[in-house]
C-alpha cells in the first residue's frame, strides 16, 4: 500500500470512529433525557399522590358525614321512593341546601327512570357525575393578567381568615416570581395592620397602611397609586371584616371600588370573597349580599379541614356560579390550594 493510499485508509478509519463516537454520545444524551423525563414524571405522580392524600385527610370530616352516609344508603338493594327520600335527607344534613338538593334528586330520579337503572352502584356513579358537573362549572383558577398592577380586593365577614389568606396569596405570588404589594385597608383593627406589616417585613413585601381608624378608601387609593408608580405586578388589598347585613359597611366597599377605578378603570381585577366553610348554609346569604353589592369575581373557601359542612360548596357553586379560586385545607401556605373539582369529588366520595 503506497503512502497516499495508507493516509486515505487511516482518514477513513478515523472518520468512522468519530461518527460512531458522535452517534454513541447522541444516544447517551437521549437515554439520559429519557431517564430524566421518567424521573420527572415519577416525581410529578408522587407529588399528586401526596397532595390527594393530604386533601382526603383534610376533607375527612365532610367525607365521614356525607360520603360515608351516602355510601351506606347505596348498600340498599332497591331503588325506590324510600331510597330517594333517605338520600335527600342525608344531602340536606350535609349542608348541600334545599334548592341544590332538590335539583340533584330530581335529575337523579329522572335519569334513573329514563335509563331504567335499578342497580344501586350505577345510580351511585350517576350521583357522583351530577355533583361533579356542579363543581366543574366553577373550577376557574385565578389567572394574573398583564394588568400592572393586578388588583385583588379581598372581602368577607369577621373570622373567615381574610388576613391569613392575604398572607398566603402574597407568599404564593412572590414565589411565582411576581412583585407583590399589600394594602392594610382593615383600618378598624390595629392588629390587622400590624399583622400585614410583620408579614411584609419578613418577606420583603411593601405594605401600604395608615393609622388605625383611617378611611379604608384612602388606603386603597394610596396603594393603587404607589403600585402603579413602582410597576408592581400584584396588589392585594385586605379589608375589614364586615357583617353582610350591615348595609353601611357594604357601602364602604362600594366606595373603595369607585376610588380604585379613578386610578385604573379596569381595577379591581378580582373581588374575592373569603368564606369560612364552618358557617355552612349561612355562607349563602353572605355571598348573596356581597355579590349584590360589589359583584364578586371569585371565592376562597377556608377551614375545610375543620368542618363536616364542606357540602356547602355544592350549594355555593350551584346558586351563584362564581369561580372558586382556592380552598383552604390547613395552616401552611401550601394548604391554600387551587380548587380542582375532580380532586374534591374523589376526596369526599368513598368510591
Swiss-Prot record:
It is a peripheral membrane protein. It catalyses: GTP + H2O = GDP + phosphate + H(+). GTP binds at residues 156-163, 238-242, 302-305. GO terms for biological process: SRP-dependent cotranslational protein targeting to membrane. It is found in: Cell membrane; Cytoplasm. SMART domains: AAA, SRP54, SRP54_N. The keyword Cytoplasm applies. It holds the Pfam family SRP54. One of its GO terms (molecular function) is ATP hydrolysis activity. Its main location: membrane. SUPFAM superfamilies: Domain of the SRP/SRP receptor G-proteins, P-loop containing nucleoside triphosphate hydrolases. GO terms for cellular component: cytoplasm; plasma membrane. Its EC number is 3.6.5.4. Part of the signal recognition particle protein translocation system, which is composed of SRP and FtsY. SRP is a ribonucleoprotein composed of Ffh and a 4.5S RNA molecule. Belongs to the GTP-binding SRP family. FtsY subfamily. This is Signal recognition particle receptor FtsY. It comes from Buchnera aphidicola subsp. Schizaphis graminum (strain Sg). The lineage of its organism: Bacteria, Pseudomonadati, Pseudomonadota, Gammaproteobacteria, Enterobacterales.
Amino acid at each position: 500500500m503506497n503512502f497516499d493510499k495508507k493516509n486515505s485508509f487511516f482518514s477513513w478509519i478515523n472518520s468512522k470512529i468519530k461518527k460512531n463516537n458522535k452517534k454513541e454520545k447522541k444516544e447517551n444524551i437521549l437515554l439520559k433525557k429519557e431517564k430524566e423525563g421518567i424521573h420527572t414524571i415519577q416525581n410529578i405522580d408522587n407529588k399528586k399522590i401526596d397532595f390527594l392524600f393530604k386533601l382526603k385527610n383534610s376533607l375527612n370530616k365532610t367525607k365521614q358525614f356525607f360520603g360515608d352516609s351516602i355510601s351506606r344508603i347505596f348498600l340498599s338493594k332497591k331503588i325506590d321512593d324510600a331510597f330517594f327520600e333517605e338520600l335527600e335527607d342525608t344531602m340536606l344534613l350535609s349542608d348541600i341546601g334545599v334548592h341544590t338538593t332538590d335539583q340533584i334528586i330530581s335529575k337523579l330520579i329522572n335519569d334513573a327512570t329514563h335509563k331504567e337503572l335499578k342497580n344501586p352502584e350505577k345510580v351511585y356513579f350517576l350521583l357522583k357525575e351530577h355533583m361533579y358537573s356542579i363543581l366543574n362549572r366553577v373550577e376557574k383558577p385565578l389567572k394574573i393578567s398583564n394588568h400592572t398592577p393586578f388588583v385583588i380586593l379581598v372581602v368577607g365577614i369577621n373570622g373567615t381568615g381574610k388576613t391569613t389568606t392575604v398572607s398566603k396569596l402574597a407568599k404564593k405570588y412572590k414565589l411565582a416570581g411576581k412583585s407583590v404589594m399589600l394594602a392594610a385597608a382593615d383600618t378598624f383593627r390595629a392588629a390587622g395592620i400590624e399583622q400585614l406589616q410583620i408579614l411584609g417585613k419578613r418577606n420583603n413585601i411593601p405594605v401600604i397602611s395608615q393609622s388605625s381608624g383611617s378611611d379604608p378608601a384612602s388606603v386603597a387609593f394610596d396603594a393603587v397609586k404607589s403600585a402603579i408608580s413602582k410597576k408592581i405586578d400584584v396588589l392585594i388589598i385586605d379589608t375589614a371584616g364586615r357583617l353582610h347585613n350591615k348595609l353601611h359597611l357594604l357601602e364602604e366597599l362600594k366606595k373603595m371600588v369607585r376610588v380604585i377605578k379613578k386610578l385604573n378603570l379596569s381595577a379591581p381585577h378580582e373581588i374575592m370573597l373569603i368564606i369560612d366553610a364552618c358557617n355552612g348554609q349561612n355562607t349563602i346569604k353572605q355571598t348573596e349580599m356581597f355579590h349584590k353589592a360589589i359583584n364578586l369575581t371569585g371565592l376562597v373557601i377556608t377551614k375545610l379541614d375543620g368542618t363536616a359542612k364542606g357540602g356547602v360548596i355544592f350549594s355555593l357553586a350551584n346558586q351563584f356560579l362564581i369561580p372558586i379560586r382556592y380552598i383552604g385545607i390547613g395552616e401552611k401556605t401550601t394548604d391554600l390550594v387551587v380548587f380542582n373539582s375532580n380532586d374534591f369529588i374523589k376526596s369526599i366520595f368513598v368510591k
